[in-house]
């Protein structure tokens, strides 16, 4: 019967939690559209009014 590796010591809560410190989710970055004030991702065309950088680029 094949033996498989097992942990020699129990992982502490501090070590376990430190390993998971990068797992947190970040909320999406949103900025108000200067034209219609709807929230949108930065550096993207506004899905509500179709403006980007002060001019109409998308017909909505």
Curated annotation (Swiss-Prot):
InterPro entries per record: Ribosomal_bL32 (IPR002677), Ribosomal_bL32_bact (IPR044957), Ribosomal_zn-bd (IPR011332)
Region named Disordered: 1-30
GO cellular component: large ribosomal subunit
The UniProt record lists the keyword Ribosomal protein: yes
UniProt KW ATP-binding keyword: no
Any single biological process term in GO: translation
Keywords, alphabetical: Ribonucleoprotein, Ribosomal protein
A GO molecular-function descriptor: structural constituent of ribosome
HAMAP family reported in the protein's UniProt record: Ribosomal_bL32
Family: Belongs to the bacterial ribosomal protein bL32 family.
Function: Found on the solvent side of the large subunit.
Protein name: Large ribosomal subunit protein bL32
Provenance organism: Thermus thermophilus (strain ATCC 27634 / DSM 579 / HB8)
